[in-house]
Amino acid sequence: MKKNNRVVVGMSGGVDSSVSAYLLKEQGFDVIGVTMQIWQDKDEEAVRVEGGCCSLSAVNDARRVANKIGIKYYVMNFKDVFKEKVIDYFVDEYLKGRTPNPCIACNKYIKFEELLKRAWMIDAYYVATGHYAIKEYDEERGRYLLKKSVDTSKDQTYVLYNLTQTQLEHILFPLGKYKKDEVRELAKNLGLPVASKPDSQEICFVTDNDYGKFIRENAKEEIKPGEFRDTRGRFLGYHKGIIHYTIGQRKGLGISVGKPLYVVDIDAENNVVVLGYGDEVFGDELISYNNNFISIDKLEREMRVKAKIRYNAKEQDAVIRPLEDGKVFVKFDNPQRAITPGQSVVFYEGDIVVGGGTIERKVR
């Protein structure tokens, strides 16, 4: 595709994507705003999670912003692919006793794959979002790099580690060198109707933040109760179904043995939730799969990195080593709490994202 200055901006109705659209227009881009219709409930009405990118109010907010800054605006239907790649994945992972991150799946398959395809169909070379991240081309490496944003408290590179070189060529992150308060101030000065709109906190398609209810309604199989056992296999009681538990969880277990118990493992095959004491929640080794690397073509030898195992975690010193089947062995210098299958581990060198993958299991 011939390079041009047309860009599709994914507009969620929030302040970040709204300011992104404005900044790109000011930079001379031919900006087209698009809101992705991604999820509807069984009554075919838009899910209304307050502040969420799926709500009808979000569409109205995005349209008002587009009118205010003077850009074209469309709503595009991504419902079927979103259900397949995000909803079904979310439900299936919980049924397997794992804890998924739907935002990572949405970025990988929807925002930077499907939306990019739609952009190309309307002759737009770029897709832009309101993510806090920086993209740069490194002449020496001959590669695009993904780097942490200036506002480290808002940095979103953890959920972007799956980006490919082709995708990075066609992606713009206008907010990478801004701080959040600067973005809000700019929106306020521009008179944008979303200037003071709060950030979305919950998963956009789960109403009331009730994961269990959502999974029960969308699962193809019955959620069955099962047994709690300790790390030696001794029976402790009964659980309500493995979808209600995640590694490191303490609350809501309904089991009392005199000392606090935590979820340390989930055996989906046998429908068993394994409980242990505080020290048993920690581990310093894991294996990741579905790995993607950005700053390097592939991992060919042992490498010292900083790594983190969840979005809000602090980076920790670690060594990563390639395994024969494309998986990666990760050894932390210090034990980490609640290494959780289904979540992602992301590797950094300073501000540069090396890559990352999905946690398959804790080794020890």
UniProtKB/Swiss-Prot annotation:
Sequence segments annotated as region (Interaction with tRNA): 154-156, 310-311
Listed InterPro entries: MnmA-like, MnmA-like_C, MnmA-like_central, MnmA-like_central_sf, Rossmann-like_a/b/a_fold
Residue numbers marked as site, Interaction with tRNA: H131, Q343
UniProt catalytic activity: S-sulfanyl-L-cysteinyl-[protein] + uridine(34) in tRNA + AH2 + ATP = 2-thiouridine(34) in tRNA + L-cysteinyl-[protein] + A + AMP + diphosphate + H(+)
Signal sequence extent: none
Active-site residues, as the UniProt record annotates them: C106 (nucleophile), C204 (cysteine persulfide intermediate)
UniProt keywords, alphabetically: ATP-binding, Cytoplasm, Disulfide bond, Nucleotide-binding, RNA-binding, Transferase, tRNA processing, tRNA-binding
Disulphide bridges: C106-C204
GO cellular component: cytoplasm
UniProt-recorded Gene Ontology molecular function terms: ATP binding; tRNA binding; tRNA-uridine 2-sulfurtransferase activity
Binding-site residues for ATP, renumbered to this chain: G10, M11, S12, G13, G14, V15, D16, S17, M36, G130
Chief subcellular location: cytoplasm
Top-level taxon: Bacteria
Location in or out of the cell: Cytoplasm
Gene Ontology BP annotations: tRNA wobble position uridine thiolation
UniProt EC number: 2.8.1.13
Family annotation (SUPFAM superfamilies): Adenine nucleotide alpha hydrolases-like (SSF52402)
Leading EC class: transferase
PANTHER family: MITOCHONDRIAL TRNA-SPECIFIC 2-THIOURIDYLASE 1, TRNA 5-METHYLAMINOMETHYL-2-THIOURIDYLATE -METHYLTRANSFERASE
HAMAP family: tRNA_thiouridyl_MnmA
Family named by the database record: Belongs to the MnmA/TRMU family.
Record's function text: Catalyzes the 2-thiolation of uridine at the wobble position (U34) of tRNA, leading to the formation of s(2)U34.
Full protein name: tRNA-specific 2-thiouridylase MnmA 1
Lineage: Bacteria, Bacillati, Bacillota, Clostridia, Thermoanaerobacterales
